[in-house]
Amino acid sequence: MTAQLIDGNALAKQLRAEAAQRAAALTARGHQPGLAVILVGEDPASQVYVRNKIKACEDNGFLSSFDRYPADLSEADLLGRIDALNRDPRIHGILVQLPLPKHIDSHKVLEAIAPEKDVDGFHVANAGALMTGAPLFRPCTPYGCMKMLESINYPVRGANAVVVGASNIVGKPMAMLLLQSGATITICNSKTRDLAAHTREADIIVAAVGRRNIITADMVKPGAVVIDVGMNRDDAGKLCGDVDFAGVKEVAGYITPVPGGVGPMTITMLLINTLEAAERAAEGAALAA
């Protein structure tokens, strides 16, 4: 068996085309979707991610605002800029690129973003609402993973799903979205004893721990769906995920590649979250008129 690829680039292209149409319709009504991105410091990976997000906005008819600050920016100044963006009616989504410099409290910064503009879904109000099944925004990477499962018409309800990784950004919300779709969830991490005992029982594996080759072929049930969220570098400096792709693709039923899998979907769902924020703002403006 050779796994079928879940092509994140192709799915992202389709979803972005749909988002661009909706954005054009909103813009025609005077409500162009707007995303503000803030980058503090010179982290090379963050610079790449931010460039990709800004380009995605520009390519799909979104207004984009990019604030780039030196690493010694004060926390107070950053909070002041977020406050200004919260009050700017042209901006519907605010994204602060992580990680932040150590002297800045990232929790405080994320909580400063207005929940209705928290398109990353990290604010405690949105994280809490996710628990109840009614979030304003789903975190972009888990949301993209769910769209990938949807694209192959996978029957999530009743499936055994193992999420490897328990971060607030991916692992925890991923587990919650799968649970709400009717899956039976096991959450593991890099220190889980006998990880393979859990993954071998899984119909769906989501690898999001940030460790190269943590999932190998002998750990995967034949026919399973394997979604690789990891972003690592191999010995040659080439981008790779958390999954041993060459081995696992001979066992799994479906697999996402790295690159070209989850990555493009994360940015796509950021656009969709921003679009939905703009649509809500437009509805609110119409009701107030």
UniProtKB/Swiss-Prot annotation:
Gene Ontology process terms (BP): L-histidine biosynthetic process; methionine biosynthetic process; purine nucleotide biosynthetic process; tetrahydrofolate interconversion
PROSITE patterns (UniProt xref): THF_DHG_CYH_1, THF_DHG_CYH_2
GO cellular component, as recorded: cytosol
Binding annotation for NADP(+): 165-167, 190
Keywords, ordered alphabetically: Amino-acid biosynthesis, Histidine biosynthesis, Hydrolase, Methionine biosynthesis, Multifunctional enzyme, NADP, One-carbon metabolism, Oxidoreductase, Purine biosynthesis
InterPro entries linked to this entry: Aminoacid_DH-like_N_sf, NAD(P)-bd_dom_sf, THF_DH/CycHdrlase, THF_DH/CycHdrlase_cat_dom, THF_DH/CycHdrlase_CS, THF_DH/CycHdrlase_NAD-bd_dom
Catalytic activity: (6R)-5,10-methylene-5,6,7,8-tetrahydrofolate + NADP(+) = (6R)-5,10-methenyltetrahydrofolate + NADPH; (6R)-5,10-methenyltetrahydrofolate + H2O = (6R)-10-formyltetrahydrofolate + H(+)
CDD domains reported in the protein's UniProt record: NAD_bind_m-THF_DH_Cyclohyd
Pathway, per record: One-carbon metabolism; tetrahydrofolate interconversion
SUPFAM superfamilies according to UniProt: Aminoacid dehydrogenase-like, N-terminal domain (SSF53223), NAD(P)-binding Rossmann-fold domains (SSF51735)
E.C. number: 1.5.1.5, 3.5.4.9
Protein family according to the UniProt entry: Belongs to the tetrahydrofolate dehydrogenase/cyclohydrolase family.
HAMAP family: THF_DHG_CYH
Role played: Catalyzes the oxidation of 5,10-methylenetetrahydrofolate to 5,10-methenyltetrahydrofolate and then the hydrolysis of 5,10-methenyltetrahydrofolate to 10-formyltetrahydrofolate.
Subunit structure comment from the entry: Homodimer.
The protein's name: Bifunctional protein FolD
Lineage: Bacteria, Pseudomonadati, Pseudomonadota, Betaproteobacteria, Burkholderiales
